Design a protein with these regions (language model features):
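Short beta->alpha linker loops
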Residues: 36, 67, 89-90, 139, ...
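Glycine-rich phosphate-binding loop of ATP-dependent small-molecule kinases
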Residues: 1-67, 108, 186, 190-201
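ATP-dependent NMP and nucleoside kinases share a basic, alpha-helical "lid"
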Residues: 99-147
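ATP-dependent small-molecule kinase phosphotransfer cores
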Residues: 36-114
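Short, well-ordered beta-strand core segments
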Residues: 31, 133-136, 171-172
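Short alpha-helical
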Residues: 15, 47, 81, 93, ...
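Small-molecule kinase domains that catalyze NTP-dependent phosphoryl transfer to phosphate-bearing small molecules
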Residues: 98, 128-130, 141, 147-201
């Protein structure tokens, strides 16, 4: 049995990455998001908690005594230096957790053909080499804002959609319905599953 084909989903805020990830899950892929991994680290890693308190103070802790994402976001998204520091703290840990997850999948008696991870800053942090295939999900800025994408300066740090599409193996312009996206993902899953099967021969 071959190892799962490693796929990354990337794209701008509000483009529909999480919706696409859920579709991949429905169609048989193992899935995890970078946000899920970060949430796990904030709640369970004492070294992360200590580093955050030393940098920002106890004000970033929530009522349960663990780092609160909204309080951290309030601090860092208006301070480029603080955001850079946070990314340098978390990205190596997220990468470690992701690789461990992928290794555990490969050890299963019947591993999935495809494992998919949502990585918003894939190209920005140079993580694309860790994946076999990259899927870019894009949508016009006005549509993403209508979906609730914040206008707090985060977009300024991201590569333009055009460049992401050029660098990705597959791209989808998400201007339609969730059902239309789901159909596209189903077709892509069939392609990826077949590719992994061929590679295993």
């Amino acid at each position: 049995m071959s190892r799962p084909l490693a796929v990354a989903i990337t794209g701008g805020v509000g483009a529909g990455k999480s919706t696409a990830l859920a579709s991949f899950r429905r169609h048989g892929a193992a899935t995890v998001s970078s946000d899920e991994i970060v949430h796990h680290l904030l709640k369970s890693d004492p070294d992360v908690k200590q580093a955050l308190v030393e940098r920002f103070g106890v004000e970033v802790l929530g009522p349960d005594g663990t780092p609160d994402r909204e309080r951290i976001a309030f601090r860092v998204f208006r301070d480029r230096e603080a955001l850079d520091w946070l990314e340098q703290l978390l990205h190596p840990l997220v990468s470690r957790e992701y690789l461990t997850w992928r290794e555990e999948l490969a050890k299963l008696p019947n591993p999935p053909a495809v494992c998919v991870t949502e990585v918003p800053l894939l190209y920005e942090v140079g993580a694309e080499s860790r994946f076999d295939k990259v899927v870019a999900i894009t949508a016009p800025r006005k549509l993403r804002e209508a979906r609730g994408a914040p206008s707090d300066g985060r977009e300024e740090r991201l590569l333009p959609d055009r460049e992401k599409v050029e660098r990705a193996d597959y791209a989808y312009v998400n201007t339609g319905t969730p059902d239309e996206l789901d159909v596209w993902v189903a077709d892509l899953m069939a392609t990826l599953t077949e590719a992994n099967s061929e590679a295993a021969k």
